[in-house]
Amino acid sequence: VATKRGIQYIPAIDGLRAVAVIAVILYHLGISWIPGGFLGVDLFFVISGYVITRLLLDSIQERGGLDLRDFYMARIRRLLPPLIFMIVVTSIVVGIWAPDTTKKFLTDAPFSIFGGMNWWLVFNEQDYFESSGRPPLLQHTWSLAVEAQFYLLWPLILLVVLKYFGKKVIPAAALIIAAISGIALMLVSFQLDATNTS
């Protein structure tokens, strides 16, 4: 096992990322034999959770603490430049070939940049799986927003857990948080289903 970016590098993780990418691409291409391809996004979330938690725990163990400023700045430098580049290029394309969507695009852009696109879609009752009509051009950045919110909150939660309970309870804390998140997701799904059928 090699070392990459200061943490233990596991080649199989890159393999899982490749599987997730292929699954998502095939899903969006409408391949009928892989209807659950969108779950590749969930796989990305699991991988990110594992990698970031390992990174944070290794940093705490090696330095005796966690520099939140360095962590947040590293995440910003990693995510924001390509996101802004994509938005700028898309805005040019929109202005030339789809000017009728410019207002909606400019309204959505700040929520995409500042990591709130998922909540903006919820607020506007926008169904990601809606097949009719033209979806918002930045709708896909909801997953990036979820990841950004995880980056923001998880280090704080981890520090609190370590301070008051110790390292041994981290797996239990992660399971509890996952269970709560799963219950919340299920409740939201039932609510959306009820709305769609009413």
Give, region by region, the residue ranges found by the protein language model.
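Membrane-interface helix/loop caps of multi-pass membrane proteins
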Residues: 1-198
